[in-house]
């Protein structure tokens, strides 16, 4: 909203970060893309841009970790196999997306990478955390632990 209005906290802005549904509609708002961060990250790092992960408390232990990872995977697979039902559910959170855009948006974030987190995606998360530490955004280095069938 701030970029659309040209003001944030009472100060003029002429650039911003477009996320979520805005990726599909920003041009209709009269905005233009200066840099696609996904393309920039891929070109500069040779890895996909990590968009999000699920976390679980370490103290729950490996058995619960694997069980929860399995349940999440089953849920995602169910949604992929029952796409129309999943899209109907997602529509209640869609913030103004029509059916075609909703389908495209969901496909951007729920896909084969969501089911099986490949090594390349793990490396991307590690690179993001490493870069955040090097820039002083993290107080200490963070090394993620991956859980589930595709965990290390």
Summary of predicted features, one role per range:
Residues 2-92:
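Pocket-lining segment of extracytoplasmic ligand-binding domains
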Residues 61-131:
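Secondary-structure end/capping motifs
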Residues 122-125, 129-152:
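Long, low-complexity C-terminal extensions of enzymes
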């Amino acid at each position: 909203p701030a970029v659309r209005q040209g003001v944030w906290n009472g100060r003029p802005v002429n650039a911003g970060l477009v996320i979520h549904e805005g990726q599909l509609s920003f041009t209709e708002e009269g905005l233009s893309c200066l840099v696609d961060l996904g393309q920039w990250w891929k070109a500069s790092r040779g890895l996909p841009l990590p968009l999000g992960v699920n976390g679980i408390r370490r103290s729950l232990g490996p058995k619960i970790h694997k069980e929860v990872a399995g349940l999440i995977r089953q849920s995602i697979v169910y949604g992929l196999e029952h796409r129309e039902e999943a899209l109907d559910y997602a529509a209640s959170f869609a913030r103004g997306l029509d059916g075609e855009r909703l389908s495209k948006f969901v496909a951007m974030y729920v896909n084969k990478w969501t089911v099986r987190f490949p090594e390349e995606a793990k490396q991307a998360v590690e690179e993001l955390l490493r870069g955040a530490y090097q820039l002083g955004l993290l107080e200490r280095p963070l090394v993620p632990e991956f859980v589930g069938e595709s965990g290390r």
